[in-house]
């Protein structure tokens, strides 16, 4: 694959992460990580797919919450063979009684690796710097 094709494949994984997270497909989201991959959030850190899935389930909880979707922007990808360092920004938009609103925003820092022809997260750091005070 060319460098452009590799970068596009990485962007597809980033998009799939959001689709799976936004649709409560947590096991499928965790499957985008390597077997020893780490999901590092403001609410905790999970290493390995089982821990990643358990952490997202704990964070999301069981209480009803407004529907929200992630938007990822300003994606920068630095390829180095079968590894990549990625930086991007994200924002969530959610429903509220007053209409759509920004729920939270921040940045992702990713270490990705290509395994068996698939790009996967080895490490995803989420810096959440815009959010409701509640």
Regions found by a protein language model. Name each.
Residues 70-72, 103-108:
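Short, surface-exposed coil-to-beta transition loops
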Residues 43-44, 97-101:
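Short, solvent-exposed loop/turn segments at secondary-structure boundaries
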Residues 85, 105-133:
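Short beta-strand edge/turn micro-motifs at domain boundaries
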Residues 92-94, 128:
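Beta-strand elements of well-folded, non-transmembrane domains
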Residues 1-31:
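Short, low-complexity N-terminal intrinsically disordered segments enriched in polar/charged residues
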Residues 18, 62-65, 97:
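Short helix-to-loop capping/linker segments positioned immediately adjacent to catalytic or ligand/cofactor-binding
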Residues 26-91:
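A solvent-exposed, acidic/Ser-Thr-rich amphipathic alpha-helical stretch
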Residues 63, 99-101, 113:
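Short aromatic-glycine motifs in intrinsically disordered, low-complexity regions
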